[in-house]
Each structure stands twice: as structure tokens, then as C-alpha cells.
């Protein structure tokens, strides 16, 4: 199972998934509005064949009088792929993107009062809290729970993760620099050792030459002496 950022070519399949899963449906232009205005915030879940089995459609609320916050327009997972944690993964990805791209402080959504399964998911698994009841929010006149999830803790965790990542990067660079410095010292020591060996070899060679010269001179002197003695004896 793969979770990834939604692309424009995914929008029609996201709409198809919506029609299969939810009573709240949207025209195609509404999907394009989200995809083109906030391309970082919507995600899809796809199976091993690349088919979309779940999605989250998200946006930022454009309220200048409030702190930056996102809104989940629609979240759906096909019945065949439920209870796999996909809803939580999709929600977390969208929330993280809201923090990283828009510094969102919280994320909101609406859910039908009668949708107990979704209410349980949002409250118990995804850490949303009911902020108010909005009467007759849906087209059929049903009330909605307006819910919010505070993103402060997630933002702090992301910040710590980035700090640790940056610290780790500096440690790696320092280790590489230290390794390079040690390698340079080893090469320098090796070069000095080679020069010392060459010096010793040169000294040994000079000593050998001297010894050979002395031996040669001694031999020549002996030959001359022997020749002289032989000459005296003959006379």
C-alpha cells in the first residue's frame, strides 16, 4: 500500500472513490479547486496495482481574522481496505503538509451527528475534539459536529525531527572531515617514512662503496709488492 501526494490526473478517481464511499459528493470543479489551489495538501492511498482505494481532500481556510488552519473537506477509504490504518495515515500526511507549508495551528472538519463510526475514528484515533454543533449543515437538514485537531504537538515533533536530522548531518560532515584529516596525516607520515628509508639506503650504499674502494686499494698494493719480490728473486 502506498500513500502519496495527489496529482491532477488522480482527481477523477478520487471523485469516483467519493461516490462509492460517502453521501456527500462534489462536482469535479471542486476537486480541481483543491488540487490547483493547495496541491501539497491532498493525498491518495493506492494498492499494489496503482488503483486508488482512499483519499483525503484538504485545503487551508482563508480567514484573515483567525490563526492559520487547515480543513479536511473529504476523507474516504473503500470498504475493502478499511481497518488497515489508511485513514490515519492520510490524515497525518495532510496535517503534516499543512504545518510544513502553511504553519497551520490546527485542522478542522465536519461530520454527521449520525455517523458514529466516523465520530469514533476522529475522536479516539485521530485526536479531534468537538468544538460545536452546526444545525442543518448538510443538504438533507442533518446537523454536523464541527471538530478540531490541535497541531501543536505534531509541529513540535516535526521541529525536533528536523533539528536531529540537521544535527546528524553536521556530525556526519565532522566525521568525514576528521577522516580526511587523519588520512592526510597518515599519508604525510608515510611520506616521511619513505624519505627516511631512502636516506638510510643512501648511507648504506655510501658505506659499501667505501669498503669496496679500500678492498681494491689493498689488493692493488699487495699485487705490486708481490711483483717486486718476484723481480728481486730473479735477479
UniProtKB/Swiss-Prot annotation:
<dbReference type="GO" id="GO:0008080">
    <property type="term" value="F:N-acetyltransferase activity"/>
</dbReference>
<dbReference type="InterPro" id="IPR045047">
    <property type="entry name" value="Ard1-like"/>
</dbReference>
<dbReference type="GO" id="GO:0043022">
    <property type="term" value="F:ribosome binding"/>
</dbReference>
<feature type="domain" description="N-acetyltransferase">
    <location>
        <begin position="1"/>
        <end position="152"/>
    </location>
</feature>
<dbReference type="GO" id="GO:0031415">
    <property type="term" value="C:NatA complex"/>
</dbReference>
<keyword id="KW-0007">Acetylation</keyword>
<dbReference type="GO" id="GO:0008999">
    <property type="term" value="F:protein-N-terminal-alanine acetyltransferase activity"/>
</dbReference>
<dbReference type="GO" id="GO:0004596">
    <property type="term" value="F:protein-N-terminal amino-acid acetyltransferase activity"/>
</dbReference>
<dbReference type="InterPro" id="IPR016181">
    <property type="entry name" value="Acyl_CoA_acyltransferase"/>
</dbReference>
<feature type="compositionally biased region" description="Basic and acidic residues">
    <location>
        <begin position="196"/>
        <end position="213"/>
    </location>
</feature>
<dbReference type="GO" id="GO:0005829">
    <property type="term" value="C:cytosol"/>
</dbReference>
<feature type="region of interest" description="Disordered">
    <location>
        <begin position="196"/>
        <end position="235"/>
    </location>
</feature>
<feature type="modified residue" description="N6-acetyllysine; by autocatalysis">
    <location>
        <position position="136"/>
    </location>
</feature>
<dbReference type="GO" id="GO:0006474">
    <property type="term" value="P:N-terminal protein amino acid acetylation"/>
</dbReference>
<feature type="modified residue" description="N-acetylmethionine">
    <location>
        <position position="1"/>
    </location>
</feature>
<keyword id="KW-0539">Nucleus</keyword>
<comment type="function">
    <text>Catalytic subunit of the N-terminal acetyltransferase A (NatA) complex which displays alpha (N-terminal) acetyltransferase activity. Acetylates amino termini that are devoid of initiator methionine. The alpha (N-terminal) acetyltransferase activity may be important for vascular, hematopoietic and neuronal growth and development. Without NAA15, displays epsilon (internal) acetyltransferase activity towards HIF1A, thereby promoting its degradation. Represses MYLK kinase activity by acetylation, and thus represses tumor cell migration.</text>
</comment>
<feature type="region of interest" description="Interaction with NAA15">
    <location>
        <begin position="1"/>
        <end position="58"/>
    </location>
</feature>
<feature type="modified residue" description="Phosphoserine">
    <location>
        <position position="216"/>
    </location>
</feature>
<keyword id="KW-0012">Acyltransferase</keyword>
<dbReference type="InterPro" id="IPR000182">
    <property type="entry name" value="GNAT_dom"/>
</dbReference>
<feature type="modified residue" description="Phosphoserine">
    <location>
        <position position="213"/>
    </location>
</feature>
<dbReference type="GO" id="GO:0005634">
    <property type="term" value="C:nucleus"/>
</dbReference>
<keyword id="KW-0963">Cytoplasm</keyword>
<dbReference type="GO" id="GO:1990189">
    <property type="term" value="F:protein N-terminal-serine acetyltransferase activity"/>
</dbReference>
<keyword id="KW-0597">Phosphoprotein</keyword>
<feature type="modified residue" description="Phosphoserine; by IKKB">
    <location>
        <position position="209"/>
    </location>
</feature>
<feature type="modified residue" description="Phosphoserine">
    <location>
        <position position="205"/>
    </location>
</feature>
<dbReference type="GO" id="GO:0005730">
    <property type="term" value="C:nucleolus"/>
</dbReference>
<dbReference type="Pfam" id="PF00583">
    <property type="entry name" value="Acetyltransf_1"/>
</dbReference>
<keyword id="KW-0808">Transferase</keyword>
<comment type="similarity">
    <text>Belongs to the acetyltransferase family. ARD1 subfamily.</text>
</comment>
<protein>
    <recommendedName>
        <fullName>N-alpha-acetyltransferase 10</fullName>
        <ecNumber>2.3.1.255</ecNumber>
    </recommendedName>
</protein>
<dbReference type="GO" id="GO:0005737">
    <property type="term" value="C:cytoplasm"/>
</dbReference>
<dbReference type="GO" id="GO:2000719">
    <property type="term" value="P:negative regulation of maintenance of mitotic sister chromatid cohesion, centromeric"/>
</dbReference>
<comment type="subunit">
    <text>Component of the N-terminal acetyltransferase A complex (also called the NatA complex) composed of NAA10 and NAA15. Interacts with NAA15. Component of the N-terminal acetyltransferase A (NatA)/HYPK complex at least composed of NAA10, NAA15 and HYPK, which has N-terminal acetyltransferase activity. In complex with NAA15, interacts with HYPK. Component of the N-terminal acetyltransferase E (NatE) complex at least composed of NAA10, NAA15 and NAA50. Within the complex interacts with NAA15; the interaction is required for binding to NAAT50. Interacts with NAAT50.</text>
</comment>
